[in-house]
């Protein structure tokens, strides 16, 4: 079995009213030799602000924070919520180059105790090695 790095940081947000406590430099220390790096960071704005430009070694970031604004439309091939004007990555899976982010819209609420069009979400990921050797990362 391969080893993976599960990296977690405290909140880091690009909007000034949210604190920037997450320290990726410390959290990724001693992970260079691990072939797969997964990051848990609450605020999806962390992805564009630091992960994409400065931490290319992080394969996937898992995030939340947006709640999908508790209002919007999600269909098989379409999703919209006013929150996308603040957070470009606000619900579901996004990719840029070899990196990915998954933003979970959460189960709870903020303010109004309900949701319209954005259902509560619990996500389960199953990690498996690829059978295709060209997709397997080299350490």
Language model features with spans:
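Soluble catalytic domains of enzymes that build or remodel membrane lipids, polysaccharides, and related
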Residues: 1-139
């Amino acid at each position: 079995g391969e080893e993976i790095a599960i990296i977690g940081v405290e909140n880091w947000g690009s909007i000034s009213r949210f604190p920037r406590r997450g320290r990726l430099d410390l959290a990724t220390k001693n992970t260079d030799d691990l072939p797969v790096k997964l990051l848990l960071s609450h605020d999806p704005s962390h992805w564009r602000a630091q992960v994409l430009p400065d931490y290319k070694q992080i394969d996937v970031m898992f995030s939340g924070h947006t709640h999908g604004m508790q209002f919007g439309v999600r269909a098989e091939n379409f999703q919209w919520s006013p929150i996308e004007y603040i957070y470009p990555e606000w619900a579901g899976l996004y990719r840029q180059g070899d990196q990915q982010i998954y933003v979970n819209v959460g189960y709870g609420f903020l303010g109004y105790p309900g949701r319209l069009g954005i259902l509560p979400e619990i996500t389960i990921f199953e990690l498996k090695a690829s059978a295709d050797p060209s997709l397997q990362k080299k350490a």
